[in-house]
Design a protein with these regions (language model features):
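Positively charged, low-complexity/disordered segments
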Residues: 1-8
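Noncatalytic, beta-rich nucleic-acid-contacting surfaces in large DNA/RNA-processing enzymes
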Residues: 9-10, 14-181
Length: 181
């Protein structure tokens, strides 16, 4: 017998802590997917999912400016530390897939985490849900079609294009004679 008696909510807290610890050790990708989907408050795809070196650059930059950080940047730094741990354990991210990614839920795909649409800076949950919904209706003809159907800003489309999330999806619906040559 331990000699300490836990009652009610104390028991729940202890049990929850044990479950979290078990998942972190035995099912790490499930732990990270759940954490980033539910608890992360300022996850930024562009900062955190472009490799360990880029992440380290931002962590160092934020640490240098620690006293000047906005609340959002402080939250981002907290999330960056967990991503840093994930990279150190040998795990990584795959690119967001405009047809397979979820609005707000991170997924485990081929031994990596696929971030949610909402992890793209400037893309809110409602827009992310609309993207997921429109993608389920069929393929996009172009980035222009994506912007129209998903009702996202030109800025968002530009960011996603810069990050390579559209793959070979053309910019416009218009066909050029050069496409046939």
């Amino acid at each position: 017998e331990i000699g300490v008696r836990l009652v009610g909510s104390e028991m729940c807290i202890r049990d929850r802590g044990l479950r979290v610890a078990w998942f972190k050790v035995h099912e790490p990708l499930a732990y990270y997917a759940s954490y980033f989907s539910i608890r992360a408050t300022a996850f930024d795809y562009e900062i955190m999912c472009q490799g360990r070196e880029r992440l380290e650059y931002y962590i160092n930059d934020y640490n240098r400016r620690k006293n000047e950080l906005s609340d959002k940047e402080k939250n981002t730094l907290d999330d960056m530390h967990l991503v840093q741990e994930m990279y150190a354990r040998g795990f990584g991210f795959c690119k967001i897939d405009i047809y397979r990614s979820k609005a707000t839920r991170f997924q485990i795909v081929d031994g990596k985490l696929m971030p949610a649409f909402s992890s793209i800076d400037g893309l809110g949950d409602k827009a992310a849900e609309l993207i997921e919904d429109e993608a389920s209706k069929g393929e996009f003809l172009s980035q222009e079609d994506f912007k129209t159907r998903c009702k996202v800003s030109a800025n968002t489309v530009e960011t996603m294009d810069r990050l390579g999330l559209f793959g070979d999806l053309p910019h416009s619906n218009q066909i050029s004679l050069m496409d046939f040559l």
